[in-house]
Structure formats: C-alpha cells, structure tokens
Amino acid sequence: MDEQEIQRLVEEVSLQYFEMPFLHKAVFNNRLRTTGGRYLLKSHNIELNYRYYEVYGEEELVGIIKHELCHYHLHIAGRGYKHRDRDFRELLKKVDAPRFCKRMINEEKEKKIYKYECMECSLQYVRRRQINTKRYVCGKCKGKLKPISKTS
C-alpha cells in the first residue's frame, strides 16, 4: 500500500463513518514504534504505522484510521479530542473504533548475557551489561574477575 492508497482509504473511511470529508494528509511514518498512528494537532495530518498494516492487515489499519479520525474531527469541531474526554469516547463507540490498538508483536531483541568468574573464589556473575573487569572486583573476596562467555 502506497501513500496515495492510504490517503484514499482515509478519505473513504472518513466519509463512510463520520459523513465528513478528510481534508488533510494521511501518510505512513516508518519511525513510529509503539503506536498504531497519531494525529498531529498543528498540521491536522494523520501518521500511521506501516508495520501494523504488514502484521495485522487492512482491518486493523481501518480501526486505527477510525481512532485517529475521531481525534481529527473532534479537534476540527472544537470539541474534546483527548482520550480522557467524554466526546471522544462517545464518538469511538458510535463508529466502533478501538480505544487502543493491538500490541505489536516485536521480534525479541537478542539479549546479550555476559558471564564473569572470580579468579580467587570461582563465584560466577551473570550480567546483562558488560563489566569493566579492570575497575570492578568480586563482591565476596575482592578477587579479579575474568569473562567466561558472552551469549546472545
């Protein structure tokens, strides 16, 4: 789906569910990570997360578009457009838009695990962050630490 298709889809959803035209721009923003979309107050544009379209399909994207259009139309009308406002929640129910989008299934980042061993007492330390072995010593016997392994 490209920029023109998403613009057309947002305009269609606006007319179908809100019976009002969408007169601004709708674009995909690849930098969005934790949200399905956002409505920009100053420019009145809507930005959408392309990954939600890839992972969940057009149906979830339409739900996100309806949610952002609720912000848009209420803000344009001068009514309460924030999540906590009654006008916003009532309009969400009216158009059957989700209040929150689904959680993104993100590929778990490889969690590096560093293992260190005391050269004196053989106590092992497991850490998620690397330790400067020249600066830090064993907490039990004050012996030097040596790295054993780094797993990812």
Curated annotation (Swiss-Prot):
Organism this protein belongs to:
Bacillus cereus (strain B4264)
Q: Where in the cell is it found?
A: Cytoplasm
Entries under HAMAP family matching the protein: SprT_like (MF_00745)
Q: Domain (SprT-like): give its ranges.
A: 7-147
Would you identify the family this protein belongs to, as annotated? Belongs to the SprT family.
GO CC, sorted alphabetically, is: cytoplasm
Give the positions the UniProt entry annotates as the active site. Answer: 68
Question: Which residues does the annotation say bind Zn(2+)?
Answer: 67, 71
What processes does the entry annotate via GO biological process terms?
response to stress
- InterPro entries documented for this protein: SprT-like_domain, SprT_Zn_ribbon, Uncharacterised_SprT-like
For this entry, the protein name equals Protein SprT-like
Molecular functions per Gene Ontology: zinc ion binding
Cystine pairs annotated here are none
- List keywords of the entry alphabetically: Cytoplasm, Metal-binding, Zinc
Q: Which domain of life is it from?
A: Bacteria
| Needed co-factor(s) | Zn(2+)
Cofactor descriptive note: Binds 1 zinc ion.
Pfam families under this entry? SprT-like (PF10263), Zn_ribbon_SprT (PF17283)
Per the record, the major location class is cytoplasm
